[in-house]
Amino acid sequence: MAMQAAKRANIRLPPEVNRILYIRNLPYKITAEEMYDIFGKYGPIRQIRVGNTPETRGTAYVVYEDIFDAKNACDHLSGFNVCNRYLVVLYYNANRAFQKMDTKKKEEQLKLLKEKYGINTDPPK
């Protein structure tokens, strides 16, 4: 066990690898317990969040205790078939999650600047 930990300490992982996985294309009726059965085989899990609103159905977040377990799960479960659906397993990216929000904020700021300087972008009639 100590030998394995020493080997892991020497491995450099890509920067996008982290302990949080984002899973898409899940069956809508999947439960957290079923997620634990599938993802728990790759290491101890700290938390699982399954989407239950119309916007988040079919998605989930899985947080592993160890980054190497998350990498192993991502490598092995991408494309895994669950109820005739092939899972899409990605590393969580905080920047991507807030990208839509940033776009709306920028559009609002642009609108305010246009109003401030009297710029009209409507096409001429």
From Swiss-Prot:
- For the cross-link Glycyl lysine isopeptide (Lys-Gly) (interchain with G-Cter in SUMO2), the position is K29
Q: Which residues carry this modification: N6-acetyllysine?
A: K29, K41
SMART domains assigned to the protein according to its UniProt record, in alphabetical order: RRM
The processes (GO biological process) annotated in the record are: blastocyst formation; mRNA splicing, via spliceosome; U2-type prespliceosome assembly
Q: Which Gene Ontology MF annotations are present? A: mRNA binding; RNA binding
Residue ranges spanning the membrane: these are none
Q: Please name the InterPro entries in this protein's record.
A: Nucleotide-bd_a/b_plait_sf, RBD_domain_sf, RRM_dom, RRT5_SRSF_SR, SF3B6_RRM
Please tell me where this protein is predominantly located.
Answer: nucleus
The RRM domain covers which part of the protein? 19-94
Per its UniProt record, what Pfam families does this chain match? RRM_1
| CDD domains recorded | RRM_SF3B14
Interaction with pre-mRNA branch site: annotated span? 16-29
- Report keywords, A-Z: Acetylation, Isopeptide bond, mRNA processing, mRNA splicing, Nucleus, RNA-binding, Spliceosome, Ubl conjugation
Cellular component per GO, a single term: U2-type spliceosomal complex
Q: What subcellular compartments does it reside in?
A: Nucleus
Q: Do you know which SUPFAM superfamilies this protein is assigned to?
A: RNA-binding domain, RBD
Where does the source fall among the domains of life? Eukaryota
Family, as annotated: Belongs to the SF3B6 family.
- Subunit and partners: Component of the 17S U2 SnRNP complex, a ribonucleoprotein complex that contains small nuclear RNA (snRNA) U2 and a number of specific proteins. Part of the SF3B subcomplex of the 17S U2 SnRNP complex. SF3B associates with the splicing subcomplex SF3A and a 12S RNA unit to form the U2 small nuclear ribonucleoproteins complex (U2 snRNP). Within the SF3B complex interacts directly with SF3B1. Component of the minor spliceosome, which splices U12-type introns.
Q: What exactly does this protein do?
A: Component of the 17S U2 SnRNP complex of the spliceosome, a large ribonucleoprotein complex that removes introns from transcribed pre-mRNAs. The 17S U2 SnRNP complex (1) directly participates in early spliceosome assembly and (2) mediates recognition of the intron branch site during pre-mRNA splicing by promoting the selection of the pre-mRNA branch-site adenosine, the nucleophile for the first step of splicing.
This chain's protein is named Splicing factor 3B subunit 6
What is the protein's species of origin?
A: Homo sapiens
